[in-house]
């Protein structure tokens, strides 16, 4: 009788704790939903875990394109700060895609128009946006490393078998069965097997922990994609139809995940699952099956990351728009190519001749400035900008270059009006000595300028180049002579400021 009362009390206590956990989880979800509503249009994340930013570049590195913003231009324009200002994404896939999008300008009107329709929809339809953000929030982040870091090292694990784990599971159930026949002997056996299982579990779990984290993320990604597929919005159908076609490919992954690969151990069910995993090694068994399945589905996982990441990144871009005091949708046109010598004053690049090039921005400003001074620019040729010290020349140049990148990535300009050709934007502005290679500032700048001239001779859109204080630090006579030739070469190849 006493044992029954004790058992009932323990059961009641466990039930109360379980129900309280569910209630707390419900309250947390409600609070998170409200925070997502309030945070739209606010500045992005300001706090990052140590090393977290290092993994953000991996999606970009895995998806090269014909032209992407190079490191010199990225650093010259402080685009890391722009990314951080914009990054209100809820998942690792989202922030990695956002970074890649900012470094990969589009030269296709169709692509940018599709992006524009999605941006408008995500800004206006709050309910759908918040629902999607909740899904992305549950998908979450991978932490210090990118999913692509883990994927690159899967081969290190080799082939993994489940025989020994199934054997200890069998022993565990046999000792439990023995406890009904001979309680003292059975309980002793259960204790020994439990200690052995926990010890071997902790040892093996430590070896696979980084990969287990990544597989948890893949599992959450698939679960999130399943939830996304249930959203019905005409503007999203192009992306979500691709998700629905991909989901059947992950059947084996889902089956292996059901063996113990839970998304979280913080909720009540997660705590129970953690103890079951220690006893039965279910998550390790699931990991070994999943390892083989992931190797088979690498390309489909990448496609899923791309779709989910794009939608999360576009919500962040829509929020960035919403946070700006003024912005406009750019009007971009492809440069016209003409036959050799067919047009007077055409600009030549890589044997191509461009005409009708233009750059027009009204009430342009830099989005990182709290109280910016707005300016206009309109030109069809190169511009030599002069002025007194501390008059804002460099800031203006950076604002123009930055806005042309934003125009061709998130289809947004920090200006009242933008009408321009498509450009490959390159800069040479904030260089410094390279002590590691022993190169002086002069050599570093010459190499930087050469890369721009080389780009102008390669196929693609015309190059829009920004050079700040050519060859500063060189003696006056040589600087004037060299700068004249450099500017002349730039003028013959591309529009420059």
Show where each model-derived region lies.
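Alpha-helical bundle segments enriched in helix-capping/polar residues
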Residues: 1-381
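ATPase nucleotide-binding head domains, primarily ABC-like/P-loop NTPase cores
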Residues: 317, 324-495
């Amino acid at each position: 009788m006493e044992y029954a009362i004790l058992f009932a009390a323990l059961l009641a206590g466990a039930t109360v704790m379980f129900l309280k956990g569910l209630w707390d989880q419900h309250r947390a979800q409600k609070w998170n939903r409200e925070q997502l509503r309030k945070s739209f249009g606010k500045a992005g994340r300001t706090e990052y875990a140590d090393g977290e930013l290092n993994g953000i570049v991996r999606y970009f590195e895995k998806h090269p394109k014909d032209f992407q913003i190079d490191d010199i231009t990225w650093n010259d324009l402080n685009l890391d700060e722009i990314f951080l200002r914009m990054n209100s994404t809820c998942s690792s896939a989202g922030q990695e895609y956002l970074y890649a999008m900012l470094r990969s300008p589009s030269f296709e009107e169709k692509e940018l128009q599709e992006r524009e329709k999605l941006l408008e929809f995500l800004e206006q339809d709050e309910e759908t946006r918040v629902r999607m953000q909740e899904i992305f929030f549950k998908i979450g982040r991978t932490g210090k490393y990118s999913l692509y870091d883990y994927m690159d090292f899967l081969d290190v694990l080799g082939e993994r078998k489940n025989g020994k784990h199934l054997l200890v599971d069998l022993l565990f159930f046999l000792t439990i069965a023995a406890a009904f026949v001979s309680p003292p002997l059975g309980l002793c056996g259960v204790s020994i097997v439990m200690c052995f299982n926990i010890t071997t579990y902790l040892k093996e779990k430590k070896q696979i922990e980084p990969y287990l984290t990544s597989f948890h993320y893949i599992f959450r990604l698939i679960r999130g994609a399943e939830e996304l597929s249930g959203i019905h919005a005409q503007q999203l159908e192009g992306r979500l139809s691709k998700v629905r076609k991909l989901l059947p490919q992950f059947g084996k992954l889902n089956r292996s995940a059901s063996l113990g690969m839970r998304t979280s151990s913080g909720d009540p069910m997660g705590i129970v699952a953690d103890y079951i995993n220690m006893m039965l090694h279910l998550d390790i068994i699931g990991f070994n099956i999943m390892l083989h399945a992931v190797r088979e589905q690498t390309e489909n996982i990448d496609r899923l990351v791309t779709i989910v990441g794009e939608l999360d990144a576009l919500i962040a871009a829509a929020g960035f728009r919403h946070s700006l005091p003024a912005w406009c949708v750019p009007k971009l046109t492809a440069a016209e190519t003409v036959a050799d010598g067919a047009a007077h004053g055409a600009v030549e690049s890589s044997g191509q001749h461009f005409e009708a090039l233009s750059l027009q921005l009204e009430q342009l400003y830099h989005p990182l400035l709290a109280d910016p001074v707005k300016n206009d620019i309109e030109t069809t040729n190169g511009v030599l900008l002069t002025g007194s010290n501390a008059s804002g020349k460099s800031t203006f140049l950076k604002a123009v270059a930055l806005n042309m990148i934003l125009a061709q990535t998130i289809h947004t300009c920090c200006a009242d009006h933008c009408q321009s050709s498509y450009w490959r934007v390159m800069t040479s502005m904030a260089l410094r000595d390279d002590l590691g290679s022993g190169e002086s500032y002069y050599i570093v700048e010459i190499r930087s300028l050469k890369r721009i001239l080389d780009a102008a001779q390669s196929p693609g859109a015309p190059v829009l180049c920004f050079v700040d204080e050519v060859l500063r630090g060189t003696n006056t006579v040589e600087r004037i002579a060299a700068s004249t030739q450099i500017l002349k070469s730039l003028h013959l190849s591309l529009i420059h400021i």
